[in-house]
């Protein structure tokens, strides 16, 4: 069931979104050669809790960390451990913060030092596809309009959208209805309504769209070992278009 948020709930989601965005800005300053993923995770945890929130991902369905940190060919759900970053890595931080019962959810792909031109273009197209999609995030459109715009922008650039994992509603639960695929047909799907809150999250692969889950039962990787990028924000549908809740 899709939950329409009232003004009080929206205010709490704005605060959760600010904390989420702040944690990602902190993560961007920490991504450097020689830094461990577990250090980045611990600093994200410290930031979220110091702002009166709790990490949405910690122990969610058994996930063992406060942030998902995925490197290079890892698409999503990377578990931060002792791995040290190296020059040229691309690092996706996916962060959620729960403030007074409401969640923010966002992700960014961050460069570790100087990266390849291919990596830069992949990140740029992924980020652009989010903004192409939310051009249709208003009550005159349907979910399929967002999904189609994302897919079209990505595939026109020669990249692939991941289809096994999708965006979602967000609110008092980290994952709510509806699902928001990054592919689809314009004019189809659920009608958008004022007060809906959605996590729109293009996951884009440099090569094949095919992915697999590692033996840890969490980390998703590209089947061809090529790079993957991820860009996500929580948004609010308003009469005048989308309000992005997870950008400072």
Q: How would you label these PLM feature ranges?
A:
Residues 1-248:
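Active-site neighborhoods and metal-handling regions in enzymes and metal-associated proteins
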